[in-house]
UniProtKB/Swiss-Prot annotation:
Pfam families: EF-hand_5 (PF13202), EF-hand_7 (PF13499)
Name of the featured protein: Calcineurin subunit B
Function: Regulatory subunit of calcineurin, a calcium-dependent, calmodulin stimulated protein phosphatase. Confers calcium sensitivity.
Organism annotation: Schizosaccharomyces pombe (strain 972 / ATCC 24843) (Fission yeast)
Binding site for Ca(2+) 4: D144, D146, D148, K150, E155
Family: Belongs to the calcineurin regulatory subunit family.
GO molecular function, one term: phosphatase activator activity
């Protein structure tokens, strides 16, 4: 038999950085986003969130938030992702989330092709393909310390942790 609603709620509180009140506000927001009232947020519903819709990486965000790859985001996945962006979310969690944006095949590495695809989403048609490929190749050469042709999480963390990326991944309130 499954867990009771109160047990699920208690688990959400203990496994996230949110208070009771914040989880309740997030639950109400989740219900509003879930337009077809299926109990989960599908890709189209997710992409209809105004702050997400305007992001060039919206489809990648959905893929990362959809932790199990099931094609929709349940409330647990929603809370887990928002927890990363809370003021209480730690730097390591934020960096792992950012890394997953680039790690399209979820193999724990960012390949040349994955970096190219994600950067292409960000720059659109502002760069020629050969210019973008040069940037990707140069980035891989500079970041790939063990010379295996791909970027591991540790290599990513080394290069990104000196920036303010994690502070821009923090939302003040929910």
């Amino acid at each position: 038999m499954g867990q009771s609603q109160s047990q699920i709620f208690e688990d959400l509180i203990s496994n996230s950085s949110f208070s009771n009140e914040e989880i309740e506000r997030i639950r109400k927001r989740f219900i509003k986003i879930d337009a077809n009232q299926s109990g989960s947020i599908d890709r189209n519903e997710f992409l209809s969130i105004p702050s997400v819709a305007s992001n060039p990486l919206a489809s990648r965000l959905f893929s990362v938030v959809d932790e199990d790859g099931g094609g929709d985001v349940d409330f647990q996945e929603f809370i887990n992702s928002l927890s990363v962006f809370s003021v209480h979310g730690n730097k390591e969690e934020k960096l792992k989330f950012a890394f997953k944006i680039y790690d399209i095949d979820r193999d724990g590495y960012i390949s040349n092709g994955e970096l190219y695809l994600v950067l292409k989403m960000m720059v659109g048609t502002n760069l020629r393909e050969d210019q973008l490929q040069q940037i990707v190749d140069k980035t891989i050469m500079e970041v790939d310390k063990d010379r295996d042709g791909k970027i591991s999480f540790e290599e990513f963390k080394d290069i990104v942790s000196g920036s303010n990326v994690t502070s821009s991944m923090t939302l003040d309130s929910f």
